[in-house]
Swiss-Prot record:
GO MF assignments: triose-phosphate isomerase activity
First-listed, main subcellular location of the protein, grouped into a coarse class: cytoplasm
PROSITE patterns given in the database record: TIM_1 (PS00171), TIM_2 (PS51440)
Protein name, as recorded: Triosephosphate isomerase
Residues spanning the membrane: none
Length: 251
């Protein structure tokens, strides 16, 4: 039985004051003990969030990490070993905004994936198609290719200690979302793709859905057999909304 996970990606949002307010709100939430719950603030606020949530069950992660595990001469970057030292537990890799807006390619993302695991952290590998690719019927081809990049480099067993987040690019920050059935179809295809390599890994790895999940649609999305939780964007900036999503995952 895969343990559900809900991870909140705060993206490039927050001030010390607004983060403190959000921490306070999260501390008041009744959260299910059956769900792994994480938030990923902007790195500037990592220590504030870790300290503020210490009395809760919420773990803290990061939105990105450098291509090398150890600290060194890489201006502007944060090493995964530094994130681990700060108390982070997981790190996003390959988020669509990094792929689309920053132009990160698979070779760079593979280095980050390896560095994150080398530091004892859990990579949350983000995969997904653009609207153009979806219209062209290339969804499964695209997500398969993104998965295969990691599998070819490290073997499918590397995904045992990872989480996969399917995030259709066209549904991020747009208010659009795949129907539960559409999301399930892709999640099932991802699991089948992994099963060709290793059935045990395919059944064990958690697949999160990351396309405009809200409290209003979370219950139905999370009821799908191959959706093990959500990677939450804008809704994670509202403590009550995020709490409701976490409770939906616990049901």
């Amino acid at each position: 039985m895969r343990r559900p996970m809900v991870a909140g990606n705060w993206k490039m949002h927050g001030t010390r004051a607004s983060v403190a307010e959000l921490i306070e709100g999260l501390g008041k939430q009744v959260l299910p003990g059956s769900v792994d719950i994480a938030v990923m603030p902007a790195s500037l606020f990592t220590n504030q969030v870790i300290e503020g949530l210490r009395a809760t069950s919420i773990i803290v992660g990061a939105q990105d990490a450098a291509i090398q595990a150890e600290q060194g001469a890489l201006t502007g970057e944060i090493a995964s070993s530094q994130l681990a030292d700060a108390g982070c537990k997981l790190v996003l890799v390959g988020h669509s905004e990094r792929r689309q807006l920053i132009g990160e390619q698979d070779d760079v993302l593979n280095k980050k994936f390896a560095a994150i695991q080398a530091s004892g952290l859990t990579p949350v590998l983000c995969i997904g198609e653009t609207l153009e690719e979806r219209k062209a019927g290339q969804t499964l081809e695209v997500v398969g290719r993104q998965l295969d990049s990691v599998i070819a480099e490290f073997g499918v067993s590397a995904l045992i200690n990872a989480v996969i987040a399917y995030e259709p690019v066209w549904a991020i920050g747009t208010g659009l979302t795949a129907s539960p059935q559409e999301a399930q179809e892709v999640h099932a295809a991802i699991r089948a793709h992994l099963a060709k390599e290793n059935a045990e890994v395919a059944q064990g790895v958690r697949l999160l859905y990351g396309g405009s999940v809200k409290a209003a649609n979370a219950v139905e999305l999370f009821s799908m057999p191959d959706i093990d939780g959500g990677l939450i964007g804008g809704a994670s900036l509202n403590a009550d909304e995020f709490g409701a999503i976490c409770r939906a995952a616990g049901n």
